[in-house]
Amino acid sequence: MLSWALAFLVIALIAAVFGFGGIASASAGIAQILFFIFLVMFVVALILRAVRG
């Protein structure tokens, strides 16, 4: 259980560095691009699965 707490602490610290630093705007732009790419991939996978049955 302590290992989970330490893992989440590290994730929170990394998020704080990105959030409070100047990297936030660049990260947000990259996140938006990745969101749309994965959204398109999800829709394509759904269509292929529906076609194959």
Swiss-Prot record:
<comment type="similarity">
    <text>Belongs to the UPF0391 family.</text>
</comment>
<dbReference type="Pfam" id="PF07043">
    <property type="entry name" value="DUF1328"/>
</dbReference>
<dbReference type="GO" id="GO:0005886">
    <property type="term" value="C:plasma membrane"/>
</dbReference>
<protein>
    <recommendedName>
        <fullName>UPF0391 membrane protein TM1040_2720</fullName>
    </recommendedName>
</protein>
<keyword id="KW-1003">Cell membrane</keyword>
<keyword id="KW-0472">Membrane</keyword>
<keyword id="KW-0812">Transmembrane</keyword>
<feature type="transmembrane region" description="Helical">
    <location>
        <begin position="29"/>
        <end position="48"/>
    </location>
</feature>
<keyword id="KW-1133">Transmembrane helix</keyword>
<feature type="transmembrane region" description="Helical">
    <location>
        <begin position="4"/>
        <end position="24"/>
    </location>
</feature>
<dbReference type="InterPro" id="IPR009760">
    <property type="entry name" value="DUF1328"/>
</dbReference>
